[in-house]
């Protein structure tokens, strides 16, 4: 199973131990729309919160250095976005994560 497949399974099942195993300790998630960067613990807390519901997930590319994934993501506030994720890997774990998102009509 690929790193992104493991991450997706952990996120979708809200398995904190598995999320922790997938993410590098020096992980950084850049949230361009909010103008901030969140850490591993913040990303796991967000994943565990139930705010993220993913559908139609497709891994577009993945090798041992980078991965690209697309998904339709619905948030608890009712907003739905088409999200393109770019991740880098280090030591077999997700090291950096950036997303680009387009709002979808409700």
Predicted regions and their residues:
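A beta-strand edge to alpha-helix "cap/lid" segment located at domain peripheries
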Residues: 28-30, 34-106
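Amphipathic alpha-helical repeat scaffolds
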Residues: 5-9
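Hydrophobic residues in alpha-helical segments
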Residues: 10-12, 47
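Short, well-ordered alpha-helical segments enriched in acidic and aromatic residues
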Residues: 13-28
């Amino acid at each position: 199973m690929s790193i992104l497949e493991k991450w997706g399974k952990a996120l979708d099942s809200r398995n904190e131990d598995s999320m922790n195993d997938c993410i590098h300790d020096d992980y950084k998630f850049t949230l361009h729309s909010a103008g901030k960067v969140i850490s591993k613990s913040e990303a796991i807390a967000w994943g565990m919160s139930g705010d993220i519901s993913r559908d139609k997930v497709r891994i577009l590319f993945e090798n041992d250095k980078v991965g690209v994934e697309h998904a339709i993501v619905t948030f608890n506030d009712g907003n739905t976005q088409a999200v393109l994720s770019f991740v880098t890997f280090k030591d077999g774990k997700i090291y950096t994560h950036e997303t680009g998102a387009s709002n979808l009509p409700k």
